[in-house]
Amino acid sequence: MKILVVGANGQLGARCCALLVEAGHDVRGSVREPARGEALRALGVETVLADLTDTSSIRAAASGAEVAILSANPVVPRAGDRPALVEEGLSRAPAVLAAEGVGRIVLPSVPVTDVDEAVPFVRARRRLEDALAELRAETVCVRFPPFMDVHLALAGSSIPLRGAQNATVDRPSPFLRSFRKSTGTLVEDRGLILVPGRRSHRNAFITVDDAARAVVEAATRDDVGGLPHATLEVAGPQPLSWDEVAATYGRVLGRRVRVLATPAVVYAVAQKVLRPFAEVPSNTMALNRYGASSETAWRNVGGGLLDPASMTTVEEFLQEKVRLPD
């Protein structure tokens, strides 16, 4: 099967490419610069230059593809990126892909919350989901809880990044790098974990690897429930509160780990104050607000796409990572 991965050098997209190649599919991955495709080409991925802000490049990338995975997003922009322009390009992409004959489009997405409309990325994602539902092509929106590889790192730990390739948290984003410089090892160094929202909030955390496996299943299986326009929630193996995450870190590190929680209202105020003159920091505060306002205590482990017994728990993830070199 010929499968296009849009945003192939991102953490999720790159893992999808690797799994698809392993499964014997003909994989094409879009990247914005040739150098970003070197590792993908080494895996056997055909790389093409495409930019979501250039519709013609997306059209060319889609030529001959049977399935497309839209893994690109502007959540962690590089210096000089314009998130709003990327979102505009993403909003056009489904119709372009369908017009080129793509028969199924898979969109990794995020949980629904009461603050979706106040968060630019999430608001745009809902519009994208709506656009997919209007297409003649088959579409699958796969909503995920927080990724362990990302959210446990942003909570103040470098452990989730050990051995990671194409890590979202390591992208060359000036704002994120500044934040990580002061908070990147708080858990290991000071026994302190930074939590958005209430410490009692529960999330069915999932690894990027398990999420990629779910996306690949959604892209390639004939028996996906809900087609032609499916929306699936894929829970990780167990819902944990942030207190339970801290306790898990404590067992892994052999020390007490305390929770420092920040209320959603703090992020909402910061988002509003920063909006007129600092788009990226404002959007980041909006995402923190979103995270602080949501819970994913889902019980549908694997979402019908993965065997629950095959999925990685938070403790298994951290135990595996802590054995790797820094």
Where are these regions (language model features)?
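Amphipathic terminal alpha-helices
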Residues: 297-326
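Short, hinge-like loop/turn segments at secondary-structure boundaries
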Residues: 45-48, 65-66, 123-125, 157-161, ...
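NAD(P)H-binding glycine-rich loop region in Rossmannoid oxidoreductase-like domains
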Residues: 29-100, 114
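General small-molecule cofactor/ligand-binding pocket signal
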Residues: 48, 142, 258-262
